[in-house]
């Protein structure tokens, strides 16, 4: 039987293959609020996401969905980064997003808290993120306890 969140309460659950339809509904809802996303939700996208849950290259991925009243209202995705550089495992925050209509209700904090708990259990002590440059995102990132903003991000295309 599928686990469903309680009505009116925010529940954070692991993003699994069977929750893809919920995540896609969330992504469509995001676009209804503000269509600034750089990818289309088409058959190829759905197929790629589905295959990713069965592909061993994605075994270091950690993703959670925040539910309210049976619908996804937020999502967080991260990946573990083990390195021989210093023998550590860090994590990279790939995406955290909450529906605009549900922001400022501690949804992002709950997602981040859930992820942080799992990272700590896995021996990860640092979560690295490239941050969105808009004011709302910057306020959120600056509000995170025990964090500091530094460095400059660069995106390098591998061709």
Go through the PLM ranges and name each one.
Residues 10-25:
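A short beta-loop-alpha structural element at the N-terminal edge
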Residues 81-93, 103, 149-150:
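A conserved beta-turn-beta hairpin within the catalytic core of GNAT-like acetyltransferases
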Residues 65, 71-80, 92, 97:
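Conserved beta-strand in the GNAT
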């Amino acid at each position: 039987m599928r686990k469903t969140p309680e009505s009116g309460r925010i529940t954070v659950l692991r993003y699994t293959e069977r929750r893809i339809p919920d995540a896609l509904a969330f992504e469509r809802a995001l676009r209804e609020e503000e269509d600034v996303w750089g990818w289309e939700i088409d058959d190829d996208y759905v197929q790629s996401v589905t295959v990713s849950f069965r592909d061993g290259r994605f075994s270091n991925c950690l993703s959670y969905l925040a539910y309210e009243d049976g619908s996804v209202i937020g999502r967080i995705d991260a990946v573990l980064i083990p390195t021989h550089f210093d023998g550590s495992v860090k994590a990279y925050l790939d995406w955290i997003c909450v529906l605009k209509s549900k922001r400022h209700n501690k949804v992002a904090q709950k997602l981040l808290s859930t992820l942080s708990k799992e990272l700590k259990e896995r021996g990860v002590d640092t979560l690295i993120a490239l941050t969105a440059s808009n004011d709302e995102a910057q306020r959120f990132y600056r509000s995170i306890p025990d964090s500091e903003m530094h460095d400059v991000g660069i995106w390098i295309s591998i061709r």
